[in-house]
Design a protein with these regions (language model features):
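Long, charge-rich, low-complexity alpha-helical segments
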Residues: 1-34, 76-173
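Alpha-helical membrane-targeting segments
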Residues: 62-84
């Protein structure tokens, strides 16, 4: 279940190893956010009335990883040191629902109730999005409900490499 490798291929410690789901549909999986900096922005869109779920857009930030030559070029050209990924409304809600306390079936049901035909087929679309977030190293799958082994909330910089955001529209609390 554990790949043991991070976003850029470096070996991760055992307590932060990305969990992988071994094939098939994600039935019974508990998707859980890994420690990554994220925040909310914008007005609330459609969302279920649940704790920790706002319906706002989610912005993910993580340090850019460069090869030696790319790093030299980035410093010379003063390129950005981080990547920002703003999720759309459906993926933002999916992100907020992935706290490790809801299983895949519950999440799909909530997405379907919220977005109706916009997200059809909900199971396939949710699975594709979750697998992509897993591949990027932002999310893991557990066979059991998450026991809060690591922080999953907004504003956490596990790398210690990100600058404090100057964008006042980002809510990382």
């Amino acid at each position: 279940w554990s790949s043991g490798h991070g976003r850029s291929g470096e070996r991760m410690s055992d307590d932060s190893a990305r969990l992988e789901w071994d094939g098939g549909v994600l039935e019974g999986a508990y998707p859980v956010r890994l420690p990554v900096w994220w925040a909310r922005r914008g007005e609330a869109g459609p969302h279920p009335d649940l704790p920790g779920v706002s319906g706002r857009f989610i912005v993910l930030r993580h340090p850019k990883r460069f090869l030696r030559f790319e790093g030299v070029l980035a410093r010379m050209l003063k390129g950005p040191k981080e990547l920002r990924r703003t999720l759309d409304d459906m993926n933002s809600l999916l992100w907020e629902l992935c706290d490790g306390h809801r299983d895949f079936e519950v999440i799909c049901g909530l997405l379907n109730e919220t977005f109706h035909e916009r997200i059809d087929p909900a199971v396939e679309r949710a699975e594709a999005a979750l697998r992509q977030l897993n591949t990027l190293g932002f999310l893991a799958f557990s066979r059991e409900e998450f026991e809060d082994h690591w922080p999953t909330g907004p504003g956490i910089d596990p790398s210690g490499e990100l600058e404090v955001p100057r964008d006042s529209a980002l809510d990382s609390t």
